[in-house]
Each structure stands twice: as structure tokens, then as C-alpha cells.
């Protein structure tokens, strides 16, 4: 119940989750699934590299999906956890998924908190966003990659994703004076006027794309200007570290 608090810095976290090996595998997985993932990407309007990156960060490309019985996990948390109302609802959602024939009780496995399959959907997310891309009558986020990619793409699209932009960029703070205006949204041109520069210390593109500034703890003279798609990633997982990791991994995937 009580887990020790051990806070990684962003750099420590990124070194663990965006490794050279994971970057290599991500590019390989993109090539292996390219035809299918491009179709899904076009249909939903979510760039393929983000679908591969999410898959990689969430479950190491479907390798680490959790071996817990989702029903047992949710039942335990519903009656023993701090957020019992939430987990009770998720338990009933999970039972509905079984009742609808998408997966058997025995095969419904996931994390200790009830997140399921290769995209780690909670049962409520499954009911809202899961997709039967191969049209076989079941939304199989456990074993069918096309359903996994389409479900992730559908989720991002429905929470506001746009394939016209990316996630954000690392920036040099330069002469920027940190003020107490949290979550201030400005255009790149306005951020440039505030003294923020590209990593090579050249001027930002003077365009009207809106961004907000994130400065992680102990991050020296650097930060991230993040765009609207970053908030879609936060909707998926409310961690700046997670969203930055997905963004960084996606940047290293060559779409061709």
C-alpha cells in the first residue's frame, strides 16, 4: 500500500525509457507494421510515429502488458483501495467487456491497477475508444496489433489530437525571466520575444503556433515548449515525463 517516494529527474527517467535499443526497435517495428499503421494513421489523423512511440513506452511494444487478472485486481482495489468508487465502476466496465464477448475472463489480463492490453486501457477507456479495425467482431487490444494501433489513434483523436503539428520541442531559456504565470500560452513568435531560443541558440520560428512552457525540476537553462498535442498525451497519462518520453521517442522514428 505505501510505496516509497523516489523521484527521478527527467534526464534519469528518459535514460531509462528512451534507450538506444528502444529507438532501434521502434524504427524496426515501424517498418514491420508500416502499411497497416499508415492506413490507420490516415483514417484517424494521428502520425504513425506517435502510435509506435506510445506502444513502446506503454508496454515495450506489447511485451510487458501485465499478467494480473483484471477482474481480481479491480475487485481488490474496489473494496480495499483509496479510490474504491472509481475502481468499482471500472470493475463493472470490465465485466461488460467480457459480457460483450471481446475477451474471456481468463484472458483478460493487465496491470495491478487494471490497465489492459498492449495500449494499457482502463476498462472505461476501452468502452469509449477501443476499435475493431480488422472487423472480426471483437476489439482485441491484447493480441491484434491493428486493433491496438487503431484504439490508440481513436483515443488521441477524440481528445483533440491534430496531425498538422507535433508535440513540442526542447528549448534554451536564454534571457527568459521565469515569472509566476503558470501554463501561460503564447505563440512561438511571442516566446521568441520573451527571450527563448532554439537549442542551437538561434531564433525560434516566428510563427503563430501556440505553445506553453514546461520547465522540469533541476533542468538548468532548458525547458520545453509544448503544443496542443502534448495535452492529448497528458490526457492519456497525466505525467509530463511520460508525455515528453513519448515525444522524444517519436522524434527518433523515421517515417518513410
Identify what each model region corresponds to.
Residues 201, 205-256:
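C-terminal functional modules
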Residues 101-218:
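Flexible, glycine-rich surface segments
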Residues 1-6, 55-59, 69-72, 170-175:
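Acidic helix-start/capping segments at beta-turn-to-alpha-helix junctions
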Residues 1-41:
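An acidic, Gly/Ser/Thr/Pro-rich helix-cap/linker signature
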Residues 24-32, 41-48, 64-68, 81-89, ...:
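Soluble non-cytosolic domains of exported or imported proteins
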Residues 15-28, 32, 78-81, 85-88, ...:
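Substrate-binding clefts and substrate-entry loops adjacent to catalytic sites
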Residues 8-16, 64-91, 152, 182, ...:
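Catalytic and substrate-binding regions of cell-wall glycan-acting enzymes that process beta-1,4-linked
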Residues 47-62, 94-97, 152-153:
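Short, functionally critical alpha-helical segments immediately adjacent to catalytic or ligand/cofactor-binding
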Amino acid at each position: 500500500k505505501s510505496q516509497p517516494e523516489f523521484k527521478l529527474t527527467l534526464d534519469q527517467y528518459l535514460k531509462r525509457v528512451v534507450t538506444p535499443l528502444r529507438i532501434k526497435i521502434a524504427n524496426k517495428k515501424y517498418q514491420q507494421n508500416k502499411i497497416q499503421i499508415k492506413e490507420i494513421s490516415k483514417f484517424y489523423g494521428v502520425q504513425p510515429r506517435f502510435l509506435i512511440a506510445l506502444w513502446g513506452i506503454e508496454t515495450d511494444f506489447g511485451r510487458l502488458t501485465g499478467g494480473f487478472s483484471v477482474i481480481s485486481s479491480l475487485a481488490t482495489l474496489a473494496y480495499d483501495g483509496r479510490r474504491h468508487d472509481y475502481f468499482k465502476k471500472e470493475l463493472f466496465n470490465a465485466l461488460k467487456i467480457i459480457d460483450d464477448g471481446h475477451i474471456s475472463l481468463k484472458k483478460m489480463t493487465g496491470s495491478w491497477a487494471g490497465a489492459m492490453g498492449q495500449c494499457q486501457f482502463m476498462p472505461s477507456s476501452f468502452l469509449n475508444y477501443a476499435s475493431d479495425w480488422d472487423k472480426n467482431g471483437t476489439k482485441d487490444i491484447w493480441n491484434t496489433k491493428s486493433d491496438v494501433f487503431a484504439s490508440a489513434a481513436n483515443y488521441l483523436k477524440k481528445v483533440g489530437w491534430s496531425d498538422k503539428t507535433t508535440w513540442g520541442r526542447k528549448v534554451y531559456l536564454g534571457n527568459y525571466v521565469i515569472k509566476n504565470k503558470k501554463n501561460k500560452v503564447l505563440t512561438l513568435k511571442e516566446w521568441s520575444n520573451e527571450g527563448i531560443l532554439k537549442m542551437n541558440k538561434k531564433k525560434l520560428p516566428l510563427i503563430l503556433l501556440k505553445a506553453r512552457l514546461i520547465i522540469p525540476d533541476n533542468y538548468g537553462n532548458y525547458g520545453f515548449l509544448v503544443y496542443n498535442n502534448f495535452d492529448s498525451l497528458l490526457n492519456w497519462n497525466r505525467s509530463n515525463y511520460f508525455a515528453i518520453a513519448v515525444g522524444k521517442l517519436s522524434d527518433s522514428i523515421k517515417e518513410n
